[in-house]
Amino acid sequence: EYARREEDGFSKAKYSRFNPVQLFLLQSRERALLHLLRKHGITDLSNLSICEIGCGSGGVLQEIQALGASPDKLSGVDLLYPRLLEARFRLPLALLTWADGQSLPFLSNSFDLVLQFTAFSSILSPQVKQAMAAEIMRVLQPHGILISYDFWLNPTNPQTNGIPPKEIAALFPHCVLEFHKITLAPPLARIVVPFSWPLAMMLESLKIFNSHYLVFIQKK
């Protein structure tokens, strides 16, 4: 799915911050992430070791760096090498590795914080998801945190498979989990945002039109 997007010029414009709809979605997600971290007493990322599973071209890690994470404490893995090369150009101090989420090239208990932003939904095999979840738990320190951001339903794309709260809970059975339904469904956002940004924010606040879950998952 990500390889297809990489080759699709229209998709590049669609996911650009110069697209008002994409900007709305990204800023909304960032506000929700900051609120969640603050709620759990995390207001300084500079001393945290952080890894993203499925880091792509580095966009999310750049956002995390902008929030105060130390560039040399960032790590990431991805299977698409061209995207990884772009991430290395953007984040020269980060440790970015061509690797599979089922076999992470890190020691156990390596990270304070792990991120997965729409990696699970791009995996169609339940066994692969389970293996990746186990690896995430392995590399997290005791009481370490996984932040998961993924959609629970995407009926328009057969190359992805939404991951609802019940499935996330099954993947991380011995963890503390907290779910927040966020992100105005992109098809609706594409209609509403160009017409009225405040209306889009109001609709998103209702949650019934939201397509993603932001999940705080803490290892016991």
What are these regions (language model features)?
Residues 143-150:
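Conserved beta-strand signature within the Rossmann-like core of class I S-adenosyl-L-methionine
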Residues 113-127:
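A short SAM/SAH-binding and catalytic strip from SAM-dependent methyltransferases
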Residues 102-114:
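A short acidic, Gly/Pro-enriched loop at the edge of an enzyme's catalytic core
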Residues 26-46, 63:
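Conserved alpha-helix/loop element of class I SAM-dependent methyltransferases that forms part
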